């Protein structure tokens, strides 16, 4: 079984959100380096990143940037070909910075990075009580099935469930699921599984020519996929925050 494990992320970790908005998690305030990396992304995948909306996330830094550095970064990213539209991670410093820059503050992507807070010790158990009838167990949401082709410009979203496509996902089309995605035709567009941050979601496809695949925000574009996997039946999964792709044959 052949697989690929290539990490192109360097100074900034780019994640793709549920509706195609990219989240740039800043790891260093080396503005020229960040701009060069973004220029490289746009050059390698212009249809994906050219004039793409980007949210800047400074939450991974020990200290928020000063206003001059933040302005330089926004200007540099615009020159690289993307459109910074908001700041993520709502600390008071970032809140003030967003006001000074005149752009919104969003917290949509925070859960993908933050570790869960340490829970307090559980309280002592209550005294035994008379048994009550068990509440009915909620059934998981049924998977969504798409029988017809998903054409260029269309977006299909399966909320809180898996998505099965029995036909083709055309170039420029986008299929998104909070669970896994199964495509029984050709995938030429984009497939984003685990859209709400589920790292165990997978993508299965019979004929792989995807513009982009993403799981829990981590992504890989077609140019980064070895030629021997293109046109094959493959599965895509996430391992240690890196996308892996392997043939099913």
Swiss-Prot record:
Pfam families found in the cross-reference section: MinC_C, MinC_N
Region of interest called Disordered, as start-end residue ranges on this chain: 116-149
Segments of skewed composition (Low complexity): 131-142
Domain of life of the organism encoding this protein: Bacteria
Entries under InterPro entries matching the protein: CAP/MinC_C, MinC, MinC_C_sf, MinC_N, Septum_form_inhib_MinC_C
Ranges annotated as biased composition (Pro residues): 119-130
Keywords assigned by UniProt, alphabetized: Cell cycle, Cell division, Septation
Gene Ontology process terms (BP): cell morphogenesis; division septum assembly; regulation of cell division; regulation of cell septum assembly
SUPFAM superfamilies xref list: Cell-division inhibitor MinC, C-terminal domain
Protein family membership: Belongs to the MinC family.
NCBIfam families, sorted: minC (TIGR01222)
Role, per record: Cell division inhibitor that blocks the formation of polar Z ring septums. Rapidly oscillates between the poles of the cell to destabilize FtsZ filaments that have formed before they mature into polar Z rings. Prevents FtsZ polymerization.
Quaternary organization: Interacts with MinD and FtsZ.
Protein name (database record): Probable septum site-determining protein MinC
Species the sequence originates in: Xanthomonas campestris pv. campestris (strain ATCC 33913 / DSM 3586 / NCPPB 528 / LMG 568 / P 25)
Name of the encoding gene: minC
